[in-house]
Amino acid sequence: MTEKKYIVALDQGTTSSRAVVMDHDANIVSVSQREFEQIYPKPGWVEHDPMEIWASQSSTLVEVLAKADISSDQIAAIGITNQRETAIVWERETGKPIYNAIVWQCRRTADICEQLKRDGLEDYIRDNTGLVVDPYFSGTKVKWILDHVEGSRERAKRGELLFGTVDTWLIWKMTQGRVHVTDYTNASRTMLFNIHDLDWDDKMLDVLDIPRAMLPQVRKSSEVYGQTNIGGKGGTRIPIAGIAGDQQAALFGQLCVKEGMAKNTYGTGCFMLMNTGEKAVKSENGLLTTIACGPSGEVNYALEGAVFMAGASIQWLRDEMKLISDAFDSEYFATKVKDTNGVYVVPAFTGLGAPYWDPYARGAIFGLTRGVNSNHIIRATLESIAYQTRDVLEAMQADSGIRLHALRVDGGAVANNFLMQFQSDILGTRVERPEVREVTALGAAYLAGLAVGYWQNLDELQEKAVIEREFRPGIETTERNYRYSGWKKAVKRAMAWEEHDK
Protein backbone atom coordinates (compact mmCIF):
# COMPACT_ATOMS: atom_id res chain seq x y z
CA MET A 1 0.00 0.00 0.00
CA THR A 2 1.28 3.46 -0.88
CA GLU A 3 2.35 5.56 2.09
CA LYS A 4 -0.12 8.32 3.00
CA LYS A 5 2.31 11.22 2.97
CA TYR A 6 0.10 14.26 2.58
CA ILE A 7 -3.04 16.09 3.63
CA VAL A 8 -4.91 18.40 1.24
CA ALA A 9 -6.77 21.49 2.45
CA LEU A 10 -9.36 23.09 0.19
CA ASP A 11 -9.77 26.76 1.08
CA GLN A 12 -12.83 28.17 -0.67
CA GLY A 13 -12.69 31.94 -0.17
CA THR A 14 -14.77 34.93 -1.20
CA THR A 15 -12.69 35.84 -4.26
CA SER A 16 -10.70 32.69 -4.97
CA SER A 17 -10.53 28.94 -4.42
CA ARG A 18 -7.26 27.44 -3.20
CA ALA A 19 -5.88 23.96 -2.67
CA VAL A 20 -2.90 23.44 -0.36
CA VAL A 21 -0.90 20.22 0.08
CA MET A 22 0.81 19.78 3.45
CA ASP A 23 3.23 17.17 4.72
CA HIS A 24 3.55 15.56 8.13
CA ASP A 25 5.58 18.47 9.51
CA ALA A 26 2.83 20.90 8.43
CA ASN A 27 5.07 22.31 5.70
CA ILE A 28 3.39 23.56 2.53
CA VAL A 29 4.36 21.33 -0.39
CA SER A 30 2.21 22.82 -3.14
CA VAL A 31 -0.46 25.51 -3.63
CA SER A 32 -2.91 26.15 -6.44
CA GLN A 33 -5.32 29.08 -6.66
CA ARG A 34 -8.07 30.26 -9.02
CA GLU A 35 -10.08 33.45 -8.82
CA PHE A 36 -13.72 33.57 -9.89
CA GLU A 37 -16.27 36.20 -10.83
CA GLN A 38 -17.94 38.53 -8.33
CA ILE A 39 -21.47 39.35 -9.47
CA TYR A 40 -23.08 42.66 -8.42
CA PRO A 41 -26.65 42.73 -9.81
CA LYS A 42 -27.59 45.89 -7.83
CA PRO A 43 -25.80 48.21 -5.38
CA GLY A 44 -25.21 46.31 -2.14
CA TRP A 45 -26.01 42.92 -3.74
CA VAL A 46 -23.26 40.30 -4.11
CA GLU A 47 -23.57 36.89 -5.78
CA HIS A 48 -21.37 34.01 -6.94
CA ASP A 49 -22.17 31.33 -9.50
CA PRO A 50 -22.14 28.07 -7.47
CA MET A 51 -21.03 26.10 -10.54
CA GLU A 52 -18.05 28.44 -10.89
CA ILE A 53 -17.21 27.99 -7.19
CA TRP A 54 -17.22 24.23 -7.80
CA ALA A 55 -15.27 24.43 -11.08
CA SER A 56 -12.58 26.67 -9.57
CA GLN A 57 -12.25 24.54 -6.43
CA SER A 58 -12.21 21.15 -8.17
CA SER A 59 -9.67 22.33 -10.74
CA THR A 60 -7.30 23.58 -8.02
CA LEU A 61 -7.45 20.12 -6.44
CA VAL A 62 -6.41 18.47 -9.71
CA GLU A 63 -3.77 21.16 -10.35
CA VAL A 64 -2.18 21.06 -6.91
CA LEU A 65 -1.55 17.31 -7.14
CA ALA A 66 -0.25 17.51 -10.71
CA LYS A 67 2.04 20.42 -9.83
CA ALA A 68 3.73 18.46 -7.04
CA ASP A 69 3.54 15.14 -8.95
CA ILE A 70 1.52 13.53 -6.16
CA SER A 71 -0.91 10.68 -6.82
CA SER A 72 -4.22 10.57 -4.99
CA ASP A 73 -3.28 7.38 -3.14
CA GLN A 74 -0.61 9.37 -1.25
CA ILE A 75 -3.30 11.64 0.25
CA ALA A 76 -4.44 10.66 3.76
CA ALA A 77 -7.47 12.99 3.80
CA ILE A 78 -9.01 16.23 2.56
CA GLY A 79 -10.07 19.07 4.87
CA ILE A 80 -12.39 21.86 3.76
CA THR A 81 -12.57 25.45 4.96
CA ASN A 82 -14.83 28.02 3.40
CA GLN A 83 -16.25 31.53 3.24
CA ARG A 84 -19.04 31.42 5.81
CA GLU A 85 -22.74 32.42 5.63
CA THR A 86 -22.89 32.36 1.80
CA ALA A 87 -26.11 30.50 0.90
CA ILE A 88 -26.80 28.08 -1.97
CA VAL A 89 -30.04 26.26 -2.88
CA TRP A 90 -29.96 23.46 -5.47
CA GLU A 91 -32.01 20.59 -6.90
CA ARG A 92 -31.50 17.23 -5.22
CA GLU A 93 -32.02 15.32 -8.50
CA THR A 94 -29.86 17.33 -10.90
CA GLY A 95 -27.43 19.11 -8.56
CA LYS A 96 -28.29 22.36 -10.36
CA PRO A 97 -28.56 25.58 -8.31
CA ILE A 98 -31.95 27.31 -8.59
CA TYR A 99 -30.34 30.73 -8.03
CA ASN A 100 -26.85 32.16 -7.66
CA ALA A 101 -25.13 31.86 -4.28
CA ILE A 102 -26.03 34.88 -2.14
CA VAL A 103 -22.72 35.98 -0.63
CA TRP A 104 -22.13 36.90 3.02
CA GLN A 105 -21.46 40.56 2.06
CA CYS A 106 -24.83 40.90 0.31
CA ARG A 107 -27.21 43.38 1.97
CA ARG A 108 -30.39 42.58 -0.01
CA THR A 109 -32.18 41.07 3.01
CA ALA A 110 -31.97 44.23 5.15
CA ASP A 111 -35.78 44.62 4.98
CA ILE A 112 -36.33 41.05 6.21
CA CYS A 113 -33.95 41.80 9.09
CA GLU A 114 -35.81 45.01 9.95
CA GLN A 115 -39.05 43.00 10.06
CA LEU A 116 -37.47 40.46 12.45
CA LYS A 117 -36.54 43.38 14.71
CA ARG A 118 -40.06 44.85 14.51
CA ASP A 119 -41.43 41.42 15.42
CA GLY A 120 -39.36 41.55 18.61
CA LEU A 121 -37.12 38.61 17.72
CA GLU A 122 -33.71 40.19 18.42
CA ASP A 123 -33.35 38.76 21.92
CA TYR A 124 -34.54 35.31 20.87
CA ILE A 125 -32.07 35.24 17.97
CA ARG A 126 -29.16 36.43 20.12
CA ASP A 127 -29.96 34.00 22.96
CA ASN A 128 -30.44 30.92 20.79
CA THR A 129 -28.26 31.41 17.70
CA GLY A 130 -25.62 33.67 19.29
CA LEU A 131 -25.95 36.14 16.40
CA VAL A 132 -27.19 39.68 15.87
CA VAL A 133 -30.00 40.34 13.38
CA ASP A 134 -28.10 41.23 10.22
CA PRO A 135 -28.23 40.41 6.47
CA TYR A 136 -24.73 38.90 6.93
CA PHE A 137 -26.10 35.50 8.03
CA SER A 138 -27.55 32.73 5.83
CA GLY A 139 -31.11 32.41 7.15
CA THR A 140 -32.60 35.52 5.57
CA LYS A 141 -30.75 34.75 2.30
CA VAL A 142 -32.44 31.33 2.07
CA LYS A 143 -35.82 32.95 2.78
CA TRP A 144 -35.15 35.48 0.00
CA ILE A 145 -34.42 32.71 -2.54
CA LEU A 146 -37.55 30.76 -1.54
CA ASP A 147 -39.61 33.99 -1.72
CA HIS A 148 -38.33 34.95 -5.17
CA VAL A 149 -37.87 31.70 -7.13
CA GLU A 150 -41.34 30.57 -8.17
CA GLY A 151 -42.53 27.29 -6.66
CA SER A 152 -39.31 26.77 -4.73
CA ARG A 153 -40.80 26.69 -1.23
CA GLU A 154 -43.24 23.90 -2.18
CA ARG A 155 -40.42 21.97 -3.86
CA ALA A 156 -38.27 22.39 -0.74
CA LYS A 157 -41.11 21.01 1.42
CA ARG A 158 -41.30 17.96 -0.87
CA GLY A 159 -37.57 17.39 -0.35
CA GLU A 160 -36.69 18.27 -3.95
CA LEU A 161 -34.40 21.20 -3.02
CA LEU A 162 -31.40 21.33 -0.71
CA PHE A 163 -29.76 24.21 1.14
CA GLY A 164 -26.13 24.43 2.06
CA THR A 165 -23.33 26.79 2.91
CA VAL A 166 -20.26 26.47 0.65
CA ASP A 167 -18.77 23.50 2.56
CA THR A 168 -22.03 21.55 2.10
CA TRP A 169 -22.17 22.36 -1.61
CA LEU A 170 -18.55 21.25 -2.20
CA ILE A 171 -19.01 17.95 -0.33
CA TRP A 172 -22.26 17.27 -2.19
CA LYS A 173 -20.42 17.74 -5.50
CA MET A 174 -17.32 15.81 -4.39
CA THR A 175 -19.42 12.81 -3.34
CA GLN A 176 -21.69 12.90 -6.44
CA GLY A 177 -24.68 13.86 -4.32
CA ARG A 178 -24.32 11.09 -1.75
CA VAL A 179 -23.48 13.27 1.26
CA HIS A 180 -25.46 16.32 2.49
CA VAL A 181 -23.69 17.55 5.62
CA THR A 182 -22.26 20.63 7.30
CA ASP A 183 -20.30 21.07 10.51
CA TYR A 184 -21.19 22.86 13.74
CA THR A 185 -19.06 25.94 12.94
CA ASN A 186 -20.79 26.62 9.62
CA ALA A 187 -24.25 25.79 11.00
CA SER A 188 -23.68 28.35 13.77
CA ARG A 189 -23.49 31.12 11.11
CA THR A 190 -26.88 30.48 9.51
CA MET A 191 -29.16 32.12 12.13
CA LEU A 192 -31.15 28.86 11.87
CA PHE A 193 -29.12 26.80 14.36
CA ASN A 194 -29.55 26.60 18.12
CA ILE A 195 -26.00 26.69 19.46
CA HIS A 196 -27.04 25.30 22.87
CA ASP A 197 -29.21 22.35 21.72
CA LEU A 198 -26.87 21.79 18.73
CA ASP A 199 -29.83 21.36 16.39
CA TRP A 200 -31.74 23.38 13.81
CA ASP A 201 -34.03 25.84 15.60
CA ASP A 202 -37.69 25.10 14.82
CA LYS A 203 -38.86 28.58 15.76
CA MET A 204 -36.38 30.24 13.38
CA LEU A 205 -37.31 27.82 10.58
CA ASP A 206 -40.95 28.69 11.22
CA VAL A 207 -40.35 32.46 11.33
CA LEU A 208 -38.40 32.44 8.05
CA ASP A 209 -40.62 29.72 6.51
CA ILE A 210 -37.70 27.43 5.65
CA PRO A 211 -38.59 23.70 5.39
CA ARG A 212 -36.46 21.43 7.59
CA ALA A 213 -36.32 18.87 4.75
CA MET A 214 -33.83 21.03 2.82
CA LEU A 215 -31.26 21.35 5.64
CA PRO A 216 -28.03 19.35 5.87
CA GLN A 217 -27.11 16.99 8.69
CA VAL A 218 -24.80 18.75 11.19
CA ARG A 219 -21.62 16.92 12.22
CA LYS A 220 -18.39 17.41 14.18
CA SER A 221 -15.61 19.41 12.51
CA SER A 222 -13.23 16.43 12.53
CA GLU A 223 -14.60 13.10 11.28
CA VAL A 224 -14.95 11.22 8.00
CA TYR A 225 -18.06 12.48 6.14
CA GLY A 226 -17.58 10.63 2.88
CA GLN A 227 -15.08 9.77 0.15
CA THR A 228 -14.15 11.45 -3.11
CA ASN A 229 -12.20 10.13 -6.07
CA ILE A 230 -11.67 13.48 -7.74
CA GLY A 231 -8.22 14.74 -8.64
CA GLY A 232 -4.91 13.32 -9.67
CA LYS A 233 -3.62 10.04 -10.97
CA GLY A 234 -4.73 6.73 -9.51
CA GLY A 235 -8.37 7.56 -8.77
CA THR A 236 -8.17 6.39 -5.15
CA ARG A 237 -11.10 7.30 -2.92
CA ILE A 238 -9.88 9.96 -0.49
CA PRO A 239 -11.70 10.55 2.81
CA ILE A 240 -13.17 14.03 3.34
CA ALA A 241 -12.48 14.35 7.06
CA GLY A 242 -12.48 17.97 8.25
CA ILE A 243 -14.77 20.99 7.87
CA ALA A 244 -14.65 24.42 9.49
CA GLY A 245 -15.72 27.91 8.48
CA ASP A 246 -12.70 30.03 7.57
CA GLN A 247 -12.37 31.97 10.84
CA GLN A 248 -12.87 28.91 13.02
CA ALA A 249 -10.35 27.03 10.86
CA ALA A 250 -7.84 29.85 11.45
CA LEU A 251 -8.49 29.67 15.21
CA PHE A 252 -7.77 25.92 15.11
CA GLY A 253 -4.79 26.40 12.78
CA GLN A 254 -3.33 28.79 15.37
CA LEU A 255 -3.98 26.03 17.97
CA CYS A 256 -6.17 28.36 20.04
CA VAL A 257 -7.96 25.38 21.54
CA LYS A 258 -7.87 26.39 25.20
CA GLU A 259 -10.21 28.81 26.92
CA GLY A 260 -8.95 32.39 26.67
CA MET A 261 -6.73 31.92 23.61
CA ALA A 262 -7.40 34.34 20.75
CA LYS A 263 -6.39 35.08 17.18
CA ASN A 264 -6.91 37.99 14.83
CA THR A 265 -6.97 37.53 11.06
CA TYR A 266 -6.01 40.67 9.12
CA GLY A 267 -7.58 40.33 5.69
CA THR A 268 -9.89 42.70 3.83
CA GLY A 269 -11.51 43.04 7.24
CA CYS A 270 -10.37 41.74 10.61
CA PHE A 271 -11.86 38.74 12.32
CA MET A 272 -10.99 38.24 15.94
CA LEU A 273 -12.02 35.08 17.79
CA MET A 274 -11.48 34.09 21.40
CA ASN A 275 -12.02 30.49 22.50
CA THR A 276 -14.32 30.42 25.55
CA GLY A 277 -14.12 26.64 26.05
CA GLU A 278 -17.29 24.72 26.82
CA LYS A 279 -19.33 27.75 27.81
CA ALA A 280 -21.22 29.91 25.37
CA VAL A 281 -20.62 33.45 26.62
CA LYS A 282 -23.49 35.80 25.81
CA SER A 283 -22.09 39.12 24.65
CA GLU A 284 -23.32 42.34 26.22
CA ASN A 285 -20.87 44.29 24.05
CA GLY A 286 -21.88 43.74 20.44
CA LEU A 287 -19.93 40.54 19.76
CA LEU A 288 -21.20 37.28 18.29
CA THR A 289 -21.30 34.01 20.19
CA THR A 290 -20.30 31.25 17.82
CA ILE A 291 -19.14 27.65 17.72
CA ALA A 292 -15.43 26.84 17.51
CA CYS A 293 -13.49 23.57 17.33
CA GLY A 294 -12.34 21.88 20.51
CA PRO A 295 -9.11 19.83 20.74
CA SER A 296 -10.50 16.95 18.66
CA GLY A 297 -13.02 18.86 16.55
CA GLU A 298 -15.82 18.71 19.13
CA VAL A 299 -17.90 21.75 20.03
CA ASN A 300 -16.21 24.61 21.85
CA TYR A 301 -17.57 28.15 21.88
CA ALA A 302 -15.99 31.43 20.88
CA LEU A 303 -16.65 35.15 20.94
CA GLU A 304 -16.19 36.81 17.57
CA GLY A 305 -15.82 40.41 16.51
CA ALA A 306 -15.62 41.55 12.90
CA VAL A 307 -13.98 44.77 11.73
CA PHE A 308 -15.11 45.61 8.19
CA MET A 309 -12.12 47.64 7.00
CA ALA A 310 -8.55 46.47 7.61
CA GLY A 311 -6.61 45.58 4.44
CA ALA A 312 -9.39 47.33 2.54
CA SER A 313 -8.34 50.67 4.05
CA ILE A 314 -4.78 50.12 2.78
CA GLN A 315 -6.26 49.38 -0.66
CA TRP A 316 -8.12 52.70 -0.39
CA LEU A 317 -4.80 54.50 0.19
CA ARG A 318 -3.46 52.81 -2.94
CA ASP A 319 -6.41 52.76 -5.36
CA GLU A 320 -8.53 55.79 -4.51
CA MET A 321 -6.16 58.18 -2.71
CA LYS A 322 -3.07 57.22 -4.78
CA LEU A 323 -0.84 57.84 -1.72
CA ILE A 324 1.01 54.54 -2.22
CA SER A 325 1.57 52.38 -5.30
CA ASP A 326 1.78 49.08 -3.43
CA ALA A 327 0.25 47.93 -0.13
CA PHE A 328 3.73 46.95 1.09
CA ASP A 329 4.85 50.59 0.77
CA SER A 330 2.54 51.64 3.60
CA GLU A 331 5.05 50.46 6.21
CA TYR A 332 7.91 52.42 4.62
CA PHE A 333 5.96 55.72 4.55
CA ALA A 334 4.44 55.22 8.01
CA THR A 335 7.90 54.92 9.56
CA LYS A 336 9.13 58.14 7.88
CA VAL A 337 7.23 60.13 10.55
CA LYS A 338 7.52 59.66 14.31
CA ASP A 339 3.75 59.75 14.93
CA THR A 340 0.51 60.76 13.16
CA ASN A 341 0.83 64.44 14.17
CA GLY A 342 -2.52 64.17 15.96
CA VAL A 343 -4.38 62.66 13.00
CA TYR A 344 -6.95 59.84 13.32
CA VAL A 345 -8.45 58.04 10.33
CA VAL A 346 -11.76 56.24 10.97
CA PRO A 347 -12.22 53.93 7.94
CA ALA A 348 -15.99 53.47 8.34
CA PHE A 349 -16.56 53.31 4.57
CA THR A 350 -19.44 50.83 4.97
CA GLY A 351 -20.38 51.64 8.55
CA LEU A 352 -18.78 50.15 11.66
CA GLY A 353 -18.77 46.49 12.72
CA ALA A 354 -18.15 45.13 16.22
CA PRO A 355 -18.58 46.39 18.85
CA TYR A 356 -20.44 49.44 17.45
CA TRP A 357 -22.65 47.92 14.72
CA ASP A 358 -23.45 51.32 13.23
CA PRO A 359 -24.37 51.02 9.54
CA TYR A 360 -24.77 54.82 9.38
CA ALA A 361 -21.18 55.67 10.38
CA ARG A 362 -18.97 56.93 7.55
CA GLY A 363 -15.23 57.31 7.03
CA ALA A 364 -13.56 60.43 8.39
CA ILE A 365 -10.16 62.01 9.03
CA PHE A 366 -9.83 64.06 12.23
CA GLY A 367 -7.15 66.29 13.70
CA LEU A 368 -5.87 67.83 10.47
CA THR A 369 -3.52 70.79 10.87
CA ARG A 370 -1.34 72.57 8.31
CA GLY A 371 1.71 70.43 9.21
CA VAL A 372 0.03 67.14 8.31
CA ASN A 373 1.37 65.36 5.23
CA SER A 374 0.55 62.15 3.37
CA ASN A 375 2.86 60.05 5.57
CA HIS A 376 0.84 61.03 8.65
CA ILE A 377 -2.37 59.94 6.91
CA ILE A 378 -0.82 56.63 5.81
CA ARG A 379 0.39 56.01 9.36
CA ALA A 380 -2.99 56.93 10.86
CA THR A 381 -4.74 54.54 8.45
CA LEU A 382 -2.50 51.66 9.54
CA GLU A 383 -3.01 52.59 13.19
CA SER A 384 -6.80 52.51 12.69
CA ILE A 385 -6.57 48.75 12.07
CA ALA A 386 -4.87 48.28 15.46
CA TYR A 387 -7.33 50.59 17.24
CA GLN A 388 -10.32 48.69 15.85
CA THR A 389 -8.73 45.43 17.03
CA ARG A 390 -8.40 46.90 20.52
CA ASP A 391 -12.09 47.90 20.42
CA VAL A 392 -13.00 44.26 19.79
CA LEU A 393 -10.57 42.93 22.40
CA GLU A 394 -11.92 45.29 25.08
CA ALA A 395 -15.41 43.95 24.36
CA MET A 396 -14.16 40.34 24.53
CA GLN A 397 -12.43 40.87 27.84
CA ALA A 398 -15.52 42.56 29.28
CA ASP A 399 -17.81 39.71 28.14
CA SER A 400 -15.59 36.79 29.08
CA GLY A 401 -13.82 38.15 32.14
CA ILE A 402 -10.62 36.73 30.59
CA ARG A 403 -7.50 38.88 30.32
CA LEU A 404 -5.61 38.11 27.11
CA HIS A 405 -1.89 37.40 27.50
CA ALA A 406 -0.97 37.00 23.84
CA LEU A 407 -2.72 37.57 20.51
CA ARG A 408 -1.90 35.20 17.64
CA VAL A 409 -2.08 36.89 14.25
CA ASP A 410 -2.46 35.85 10.63
CA GLY A 411 -3.61 37.18 7.26
CA GLY A 412 -1.98 39.36 4.61
CA ALA A 413 -1.38 42.49 6.72
CA VAL A 414 0.69 40.67 9.37
CA ALA A 415 3.73 41.02 7.10
CA ASN A 416 3.64 44.73 8.06
CA ASN A 417 6.04 44.96 11.03
CA PHE A 418 5.03 48.53 11.84
CA LEU A 419 1.38 47.48 12.18
CA MET A 420 2.22 44.44 14.31
CA GLN A 421 4.43 46.49 16.65
CA PHE A 422 1.78 49.20 16.99
CA GLN A 423 -0.81 46.48 17.61
CA SER A 424 1.25 45.20 20.53
CA ASP A 425 1.81 48.77 21.79
CA ILE A 426 -1.88 49.71 21.76
CA LEU A 427 -3.08 46.41 23.27
CA GLY A 428 -0.35 46.23 25.89
CA THR A 429 -0.10 42.54 24.99
CA ARG A 430 2.33 40.22 23.18
CA VAL A 431 1.55 39.68 19.49
CA GLU A 432 2.69 36.33 18.06
CA ARG A 433 3.20 35.85 14.32
CA PRO A 434 3.51 32.21 13.19
CA GLU A 435 6.01 30.80 10.70
CA VAL A 436 3.26 29.25 8.56
CA ARG A 437 0.97 32.07 7.41
CA GLU A 438 -1.64 29.79 5.76
CA VAL A 439 -3.36 29.15 9.08
CA THR A 440 -6.87 28.80 7.63
CA ALA A 441 -5.75 25.95 5.36
CA LEU A 442 -3.64 24.62 8.23
CA GLY A 443 -6.73 24.42 10.46
CA ALA A 444 -8.65 22.42 7.85
CA ALA A 445 -5.63 20.14 7.35
CA TYR A 446 -5.26 19.59 11.10
CA LEU A 447 -8.95 18.70 11.51
CA ALA A 448 -8.82 16.20 8.63
CA GLY A 449 -5.47 14.73 9.70
CA LEU A 450 -6.59 14.19 13.30
CA ALA A 451 -9.76 12.43 12.11
CA VAL A 452 -7.84 9.78 10.14
CA GLY A 453 -4.91 9.36 12.55
CA TYR A 454 -2.39 11.12 10.25
CA TRP A 455 -1.57 13.16 13.35
CA GLN A 456 -2.21 11.51 16.70
CA ASN A 457 -3.11 14.47 18.90
CA LEU A 458 -2.68 18.18 19.57
CA ASP A 459 0.62 17.71 21.40
CA GLU A 460 2.12 16.50 18.15
CA LEU A 461 0.79 19.60 16.36
CA GLN A 462 2.01 21.96 19.12
CA GLU A 463 5.57 20.74 18.47
CA LYS A 464 5.28 21.77 14.81
CA ALA A 465 3.89 25.25 15.50
CA VAL A 466 6.71 27.78 15.22
CA ILE A 467 6.29 31.45 16.21
CA GLU A 468 8.35 33.36 13.64
CA ARG A 469 8.34 36.66 15.55
CA GLU A 470 6.98 37.99 18.80
CA PHE A 471 6.17 41.69 19.22
CA ARG A 472 6.13 43.19 22.73
CA PRO A 473 4.61 46.49 23.91
CA GLY A 474 7.08 49.37 23.68
CA ILE A 475 5.06 52.30 25.08
CA GLU A 476 3.97 53.32 28.58
CA THR A 477 0.42 52.79 29.84
CA THR A 478 -0.31 56.54 30.06
CA GLU A 479 0.76 57.06 26.44
CA ARG A 480 -1.29 54.04 25.33
CA ASN A 481 -4.43 55.29 27.08
CA TYR A 482 -3.97 58.83 25.77
CA ARG A 483 -3.75 57.65 22.16
CA TYR A 484 -6.68 55.28 22.53
CA SER A 485 -8.90 57.98 24.06
CA GLY A 486 -8.27 60.10 20.93
CA TRP A 487 -9.42 57.19 18.78
CA LYS A 488 -12.62 56.78 20.83
CA LYS A 489 -13.36 60.48 20.36
CA ALA A 490 -12.83 60.20 16.60
CA VAL A 491 -15.12 57.16 16.30
CA LYS A 492 -17.88 58.91 18.22
CA ARG A 493 -17.81 61.78 15.74
CA ALA A 494 -17.92 59.47 12.70
CA MET A 495 -21.00 57.62 13.95
CA ALA A 496 -24.59 58.19 12.76
CA TRP A 497 -23.29 60.38 9.90
CA GLU A 498 -25.52 59.09 7.13
CA GLU A 499 -28.78 59.62 9.04
CA HIS A 500 -28.28 63.39 9.02
CA ASP A 501 -28.58 63.38 5.23
CA LYS A 502 -31.81 61.44 5.26
Curated annotation (Swiss-Prot):
Homotetramer and homodimer (in equilibrium). Heterodimer with EIIA-Glc. Binds 1 zinc ion per glycerol kinase EIIA-Glc dimer. The zinc ion is important for dimerization. The lineage of its organism: Bacteria, Pseudomonadati, Pseudomonadota, Gammaproteobacteria, Enterobacterales. It comes from Salmonella paratyphi B (strain ATCC BAA-1250 / SPB7). ATP binds at residues 14-16, 268, 311, 315, 412. Glycerol binds at residues 84-85, 136, 246-247. Activity of this regulatory enzyme is affected by several metabolites. Allosterically and non-competitively inhibited by fructose 1,6-bisphosphate (FBP) and unphosphorylated phosphocarrier protein EIIA-Glc (III-Glc), an integral component of the bacterial phosphotransferase (PTS) system. InterPro entries: ATPase_NBD, Carb_kinase_FGGY, Carb_kinase_FGGY_CS, FGGY_C, FGGY_N, Glycerol_kin. Sn-glycerol 3-phosphate binds at residues 14, 84-85, 136, 246. SUPFAM superfamilies: Actin-like ATPase domain (SSF53067). ADP binds at residues 14, 18, 268, 311, 412, 416. It catalyses: glycerol + ATP = sn-glycerol 3-phosphate + ADP + H(+). The gene is glpK. Pathway: Polyol metabolism; glycerol degradation via glycerol kinase pathway; sn-glycerol 3-phosphate from glycerol: step 1/1. GO terms for cellular component: cytosol. This is Glycerol kinase. One of its GO terms (biological process) is glycerol-3-phosphate metabolic process. PROSITE patterns: FGGY_KINASES_1, FGGY_KINASES_2. Transmembrane segments: none annotated. GO terms for molecular function: ATP binding; glycerol kinase activity; metal ion binding. Key enzyme in the regulation of glycerol uptake and metabolism. Catalyzes the phosphorylation of glycerol to yield sn-glycerol 3-phosphate. Keywords: Allosteric enzyme, ATP-binding, Glycerol metabolism, Kinase, Metal-binding, Nucleotide-binding, Transferase, Zinc. CDD domains: FGGY_EcGK_like (cd07786). It is an enzyme of class 2 (transferase). Its EC number is 2.7.1.30. Belongs to the FGGY kinase family.
